[in-house]
């Protein structure tokens, strides 16, 4: 393990695929089982990019001060801010970085899923329930919940049926993202490429680096949006578009401050 780590950290391997050969214990039976792991080194981003490197944009601009030594600007979304020291340990940083990117992607999909049905319903498209936090209760209705409105696909009147479908749909994709599959191996679980990039958006390294920054920035906004949707649902019992319409109609009485000052515990 130590030798592999040293080999991967050597600059002479930058940009090349590194193959790790097995030990003798990995050779079993009548034939040889050779296990290889391909590690792809990210191509350096142009020094002119404002989002990477020591001269990148910081969280407070010129008033940010010096960033921690372990925040070098190598990864997208690094603004040099880590007052709690969450990124000081490399292994913890790698884990948290993966968690953030995955949550960003789900939050962007979730925010779209919260707003889009309401938007369609306001434009004449009929839904059983367009408000996101009420939609799940349709499985308890007399007709149940049909995937894509087609009872021959999944006619769900059970939370277990919904759960099973989600495990299959989400678990298969996540498993392929991490471990690869019949369509090809995955060298980077965060940015698998290949079948996950049919448009070839990652073909140009500099454009890809820019897209990574856009993804993490929009994803962070989406996570805050989802938090706001949850709070709105608890406080007002309405969806995000309904709350927006109410606020625009009467911004003085329909805002966060008004609801906070009118809140009485136990009522």
UniProtKB/Swiss-Prot annotation:
InterPro entries: Chloro_AB-bd_pln, Chloroa_b-bind
Keyword terms of this UniProt record: Acetylation, Chlorophyll, Chloroplast, Chromophore, Magnesium, Membrane, Metal-binding, Phosphoprotein, Photosynthesis, Photosystem I, Photosystem II, Plastid, Thylakoid, Transit peptide, Transmembrane, Transmembrane helix
Binding site for chlorophyll a 4: 218
Molecular function as annotated in GO: chlorophyll binding; metal ion binding
Keyword hit for Cell division: no
Binding-site list for chlorophyll b 2: 105, 154, 183
Free-text comment about domains: The N-terminus of the protein extends into the stroma where it is involved with adhesion of granal membranes and post-translational modifications; both are believed to mediate the distribution of excitation energy between photosystems I and II.
Name of the protein described by the UniProt record: Chlorophyll a-b binding protein 7, chloroplastic
Organism for this UniProt entry: Nicotiana tabacum (Common tobacco)
Gene, per the UniProt record: CAB7
């Amino acid at each position: 393990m130590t030798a592999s780590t040293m080999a991967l950290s050597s600059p002479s391997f930058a940009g090349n695929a590194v193959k790790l050969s097995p030990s003798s214990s990995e050779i079993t039976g009548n034939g040889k089982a050779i296990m290889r792991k391909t590690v792809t080194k990210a191509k350096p981003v142009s020094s002119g990019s404002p989002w990477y490197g020591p001269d990148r944009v910081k969280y407070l601009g010129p008033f940010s001060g010096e960033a921690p030594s372990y925040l070098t600007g190598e990864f997208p979304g690094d603004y040099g801010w880590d007052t709690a020291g969450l990124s000081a340990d490399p292994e913890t940083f790698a884990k948290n970085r993966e968690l953030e990117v995955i949550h960003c992607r789900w939050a962007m999909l979730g925010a779209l899923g919260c707003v889009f049905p309401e938007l369609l319903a306001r434009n004449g498209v009929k839904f059983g329930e367009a408000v996101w936090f009420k939609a799940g209760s349709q499985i308890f209705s007399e007709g149940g919940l049909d995937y894509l409105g087609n009872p021959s696909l999944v006619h769900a009147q059970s939370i277990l049926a919904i759960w099973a479908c989600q495990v299959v749909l989400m678990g298969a994709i996540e498993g392929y993202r991490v471990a690869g599959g019949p369509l090809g191996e995955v060298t980077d679980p965060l940015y698998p490429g290949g079948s996950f990039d049919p448009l070839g958006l990652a073909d140009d390294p500099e454009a890809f680096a820019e897209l990574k920054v856009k993804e993490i920035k929009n994803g962070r906004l989406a996570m805050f949006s989802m938090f706001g949707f949850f709070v709105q649902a608890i406080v007002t019992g309405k969806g995000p578009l309904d709350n927006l319409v109410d606020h625009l109609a009467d911004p003085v009485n329909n805002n966060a401050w008004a609801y906070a000052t009118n809140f009485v515990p136990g009522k």
